[in-house]
Amino acid sequence: MRILSIIFLTLINSNISFSNDLEIEELLNKINLPDGFKISIYANNIENARSMSISPSGTVFVGNRKADNVFALKDIDGDGKVDKKYLITDKLKNMPNGVSYHKGDLYVAEVNKIWLFKDVEDNLKKYDEVGFYPEDPILISDEFPSDKHHGWKYISVGPDNRLYVPVGAPCNICESRDEIYSTITRMDLDGSNREIFARGVRNTVGFTWHPETGEMWFTDNGRDMLGDNYPPCELNRISKPNEHYGYPYCHGGNISDPEFGSKYPCDDFIKPVQNLGPHVAPLGVKFYNGNMFPEEYLSLIHI
């Protein structure tokens, strides 16, 4: 498996203050890109932009970890820059970070709740008429822990039409008091039938599915306080449900935790496909199968 690590800055959020477009261009010029690639600003002044999900029509939905806003962005004239920004909600007060568009609907994850915005793009058309988002979301789950440490969520609907929701460890390193922590869960789209899909996952904020095998691949952020050089963050693959990926007992496939590692050997757990380096905090992960990149980028996983 070849792995390509590329950083794409598609949003510049309001945590960074720019006095003019020249300052933005100077920032972009500091980013090293492969030959033939170009980077530009898609949208500016999107408060605390964090997670994104894109509809087939090109609408970009944006969640955040610090503000209370969820936005929809449209490039109406196709010039690669946002022409219209919609405030879908400013009433979700507990880190509405996770967003996942699926068949006309938008799922939004707070720390402890999952919301459904039905027919979201149809409602954006009504927004143009009335000047505000016309419908309140539907609460489909309030059964997740309220811990904010690793509590913000990346979510996505999988190829099995179920919603995948991680639950991070409520600490840097600990044995959790409830088995729901340090997992990836999945549920039906109405919030029912939640189950644990993967265990021993400290804090994943990026996962995707292989376009041919259908297997989930996910990044995991490694623990702190073992120095600058240990342990690595990870890229993992899920071949079957309910397997354990090591946390808090083993890190990087072969590093026994100094506090909890004596309880289980590293051989008891699924090893990473790739160690990514210590404290690199991998986030989004995608397999590329579009038609804009060179052929050698096809079917590679991008982190």
Model-derived features with residue positions:
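Surface loop/turn motifs at the tips and blade-to-blade linkers of beta-strand repeat domains
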Residues: 42-46, 87-92, 140-147, 196-200, ...
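Beta-propeller domain segments
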Residues: 20-34, 152, 169-172, 187-192, ...
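Asp-box/WD-like beta-propeller blade repeats and closely related beta-sheet repeat scaffolds
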Residues: 112-158
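Short loop/turn segments immediately following the C-termini of beta-strands
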Residues: 65, 111-113, 119, 168-170, ...
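Conserved beta-propeller blade signature
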Residues: 59-62, 105-108, 162-166, 215-219, ...
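A short loop-to-beta-strand structural motif that recurs across blades of beta-propeller domains
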Residues: 69-72, 113-115, 183-185, 234
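Beta-rich catalytic cores
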Residues: 48, 95, 102, 151, ...
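Residue-level detector of Asp-centered blade-edge/turn motifs that repeat once per structural unit
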Residues: 55-57, 101-103, 157-160, 210-213, ...
